[in-house]
Amino acid sequence: MASSTTKILCDAGESDLCRDDSAAFLLKFVAIASILLAGAAGVAIPLIGRNRRFLQTEGNLFVAAKAFAAGVILATGFVHMLAGGTEALSNPCLPDFPWSKFPFPGFFAMVAALATLLVDFMGTQYYERKQERNQAATEAAAGSEEIAVVPVVGERVTDNKVFGEEDGGGIHIVGIRAHAAHHRHSHSNSHGTCDGHAHGHSHGHMHGNSDVENGARHVVVSQILELGIVSHSIIIGLSLGVSQSPCTIRPLIAALSFHQFFEGFALGGCISQAQFRNKSATIMACFFALTTPLGIGIGTAVASSFNSHSPGALVTEGILDSLSAGILVYMALVDLIAADFLSKRMSCNLRLQVVSYVMLFLGAGLMSALAIWA
């Protein structure tokens, strides 16, 4: 009896409970508008804030808001995407072999995290070498003897800007290699760790290398983060689009709007720190903002013929959710949380530490709580 009930559910797809096609259709338009506006606003604030003092990426307000967004992304990976992948790949509509014989969700998440590390490393290497070649060509053209003068302590050479990176002491999204360079820089002098004063000739050379690494990191981080966000946004949009239940769609509208706004804020901050040209930044922002609404539109178009409980749909959803979880968890922990919370600026500012930790836990807690409804 139980097996026949399961077979009927797998063949029929969504339950008829609370099913209302016309009401669901109208709610999907509301969802598209709400999520589009939330995502666009979230990603636009850091980009516009580059020209506004209180919203600049060097400001404490931005750092605290980014900590909240990092908590949202971390909870999205652990609580929403990994849980969703586990639910899909353990669905009784799937055959026992191989899906019940191995913990595939955790495995796919691990593979995605390791692959992200590899892409992270290779991408950083590529951009660093590209920038070093550009600098070498510039020095050769201008005369290496004049360019090679060691800069005055505390100043930065304008030729060392990476991808248009602006001067300033703001927190940068850096990875393992850039952290190593930072520690070499910090330990090369014996005093002045938090007072902003540094001594020693090695610092002039470290600044140039650190700038190249930081600029490359900003570019790579923003691109990988967008990839991770877009990959799960499509699945989220499709899931909402194929649903014909207003009871399911209503809470999803609020949850996804909240989720999209703060993911957009984190992505916008990464794009802003990478100092992309306005055209490239606009394209990346629009691509992010349109992904989930596009998924909802596609899901709405195929809702009448789509069976969310078919083996193909479940496997696709489960694998993509698990892969997205691995990417998001890696990006949140390594490139957002660790990079900022282990930085010199954070360690030297107790108030910023407290506020950032509160915002981080608050973002993770609120996003986790949304799993009750969505």
From Swiss-Prot:
Segments crossing the lipid bilayer: 29-49, 62-82, 102-122, 219-239, 251-271, 283-303, 319-339, 354-374
Broad class of the protein's primary localization: plastid
This protein's name: Zinc transporter 4, chloroplastic
UniProt keyword annotations, A-Z: Chloroplast, Ion transport, Membrane, Plastid, Thylakoid, Transit peptide, Transmembrane, Transmembrane helix, Transport, Zinc, Zinc transport
Protein's membrane topology: Multi-pass membrane protein
Topology, Lumenal side: 83-101, 240-250, 304-318
Organism: Arabidopsis thaliana
Domain of life the protein comes from: Eukaryota
Residue numbers on the Cytoplasmic membrane side: 50-61, 123-218, 272-282, 340-353
Protein's UniProt keywords contain Chloroplast: yes
Record function comment: May play a role in the transport of zinc in the plastids. Could also transport copper ions.
